[in-house]
């Protein structure tokens, strides 16, 4: 969904790899952004064709999703009641609830909706099937930021999963697998193959 910074402006391709978007977020005011979506979010989420932990709907082959949409939305209702997720009947009202500049935000949404209608993201290059307008009330928004996920440090291992010492020699009786090992996510987070972290240890 659309993401805007605390100045009410879009700042990234929301469909890019986690780390690309989060590095962009890190450069924004207070390292914070707002996720924005509208009443059609269920329809849009289904057409996003997500994989892994983002998947909210069963796969075409019948495989279950990680968490179903209805379950996730029930949590959103709790967040609305708690005041974290904002719900509004107009874009102006949503901007005020998120405490971001109204004029900037409305202009950003209008520009984004134009790109969605054209089917081409001239600003950031998001794919056509993930260009979904924000034009149907009620509108929703939530402030959020980054988190640590699969950090780059860990135990260095050999092909037998033995942990190595500082000289590159195996430490007797010590083994490590999966995300506990170093270098697994040295360059990117491979969300296209959600079994990769565990599969490499089999």
Residue ranges and their predicted role:
Residues 16-17, 49, 107-108, 188-191:
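Composition- and surface-driven signal marking solvent-exposed, interaction-prone regions
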Residues 96-99, 118:
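Short, glycine- and charge-enriched coil/turn segments that flank and shape catalytic ligand pockets
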Residues 181-202:
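A conserved FAD-binding loop/helix module that cradles the flavin
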Residues 90, 104-188:
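A glycine-rich dinucleotide-binding beta-alpha-beta segment and adjacent secondary-structure elements
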Residues 101, 106-109, 198-202:
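Internal hydrophobic alpha-helix adjacent to the cofactor/substrate pocket in enzyme cavities
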Residues 1-97:
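An anion/pyrophosphate-binding glycine-rich loop and adjacent beta-alpha core
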Residues 12, 34, 53-54, 116, ...:
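Generic recognition of cysteine residues
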């Amino acid at each position: 969904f659309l993401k805007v910074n605390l100045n009410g402006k879009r700042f990234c391709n929301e469909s890019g790899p986690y780390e690309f978007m989060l590095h962009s977020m890190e450069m924004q005011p207070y390292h914070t952004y707002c996720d924005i979506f509208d009443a059609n979010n269920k329809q849009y989420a289904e057409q996003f064709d997500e994989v892994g932990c983002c998947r909210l709907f069963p796969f075409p082959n019948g495989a279950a999703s990680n968490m179903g949409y209805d379950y996730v939305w029930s949590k959103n209702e709790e967040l609305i009641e708690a005041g974290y997720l904002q719900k509004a009947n107009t874009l102006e009202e949503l901007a005020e609830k998120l405490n971001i500049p109204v004029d900037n935000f409305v202009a950003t949404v209008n520009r984004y909706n134009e790109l969605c209608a054209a089917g081409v993201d001239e600003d950031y290059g998001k794919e056509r099937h993930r260009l979904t307008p924000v034009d149907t009330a009620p509108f929703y928004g939530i402030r959020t930021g980054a988190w640590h996920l699969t950090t780059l440090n860990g135990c260095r291992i050999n092909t037998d999963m033995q942990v190595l010492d500082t000289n590159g020699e195996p430490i007797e009786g010590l083994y490590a697998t999966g995300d506990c090992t170093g270098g697994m996510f040295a360059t990117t987070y491979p969300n296209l193959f959600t079994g990769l972290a565990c599969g490499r240890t089999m």
